[in-house]
Regions:
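Terminal, low-structured helical/coil segments at or just beyond the last alpha-helical repeat
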Residues: 23-35, 211-263
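Residue-level recognition of tetratricopeptide repeat
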Residues: 43, 77, 111, 146-148, ...
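Structural signature of tandem alpha-helical TPR/SEL1-like repeats
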Residues: 58-65, 91-103, 127-138, 162-174, ...
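TPR alpha-solenoid repeat register
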Residues: 80, 114, 149-151, 185, ...
Length: 263
């Protein structure tokens, strides 16, 4: 899985439930802070934070150990089963990931990050694209703070994988309205227009990816192929040279060496 498609949001919200609108005068209420945590919940939260950091660093096995420790300390620690699902997902343990996603969803049915990540899992690894797209549409209704474009992008990628180019274009375009510079969104739109042989539009999107200083082997190879179709030899050579220099062991570089321009 490409790094942009695996870049998941790991934001969790601690929210108090059952707040009374008008509490009785004799009672006092206060905002819950770290000082209100029990020793057990505090230790579990620390373990979960470590698990999140390991997962973000690409150390899924270590992250899994830490989240298991967190659950052993406090099975109710918020977000634990979501993190466990992501760790199993990264390790390719599909059934275990699905079970953890379900457990997380049973306690957080309206968590935008969770709906987005589970929907993407069902599309990309779970073999249930229809269910995944339905869940991504739910995530669109309750987007996570700071990442509302993600479910639109993931829905578009899933639709494209299913051959629905028109639906994919609509979803991905909605994502660009929210975040015009998202590399995965722009890469996928470039791929979509390349499939349609609309090379000029494909170029406009791949330039947003390759021109921002952090291209991938996939984006450079696609860009070189688009440039070749447009007869732009200078740009084709520039991106091909970057591909060779920056990603000498990538499958895309091997395809370049074979001259597989039309694969």
């Amino acid at each position: 899985m490409k790094r942009w498609s695996t870049a998941v949001s790991l934001v969790f919200t601690l929210a108090a439930a059952g707040c009374a609108l008008l509490p009785p005068p004799a009672q006092t209420q206060d905002v819950k802070t770290l000082s209100d945590q029990t020793d057990i919940s505090r230790r579990a939260a620390i373990r979960l934070q470590l698990a999140t950091q390991y997962l973000e660093a690409g150390q899924a096995a270590t992250a899994l150990d830490e989240v298991k420790n967190a659950i052993a300390i406090d099975p109710s620690v918020p977000g634990a089963y979501h993190i466990r699902a992501l760790a199993y997902m990264s390790l390719g343990q599909h059934e275990l990931a699905d079970d953890s996603f379900r457990r997380a969803l049973s306690t957080q049915p309206n968590d935008g990050d969770l709906l987005n990540n589970y929907g993407w899992f069902l599309c990309a690894q779970g073999g249930k694209p229809d269910q995944g797209m339905a869940m991504l549409r739910q995530a669109i209704e309750v987007p996570a703070v700071g990442s509302p474009s993600k479910p639109w992008t993931n829905l578009g990628v899933c639709q494209m994988r299913q051959g629905d180019l028109d639906g994919a274009e609509k979803s991905l375009t909605r994502a660009t309205y929210i975040d015009a510079n998202n590399p995965l969104t722009n890469l996928t739109l470039a791929q979509l227009h390349y499939k349609r042989r609309d090379y000029a539009r494909a170029m406009s999107f791949i330039e947003r990816v390759n021109g921002r200083g952090n291209p991938t082997a996939e984006s450079l190879w696609l860009g070189a192929r688009i440039a070749r179709r447009l007869g732009d030899v200078s740009q084709q050579n520039a991106w091909s040279a970057q591909l060779q220099r920056r990603f000498p062991n990538a499958p895309e570089e091997a395809a370049f060496e074979r001259g597989a321009w039309d694969d």
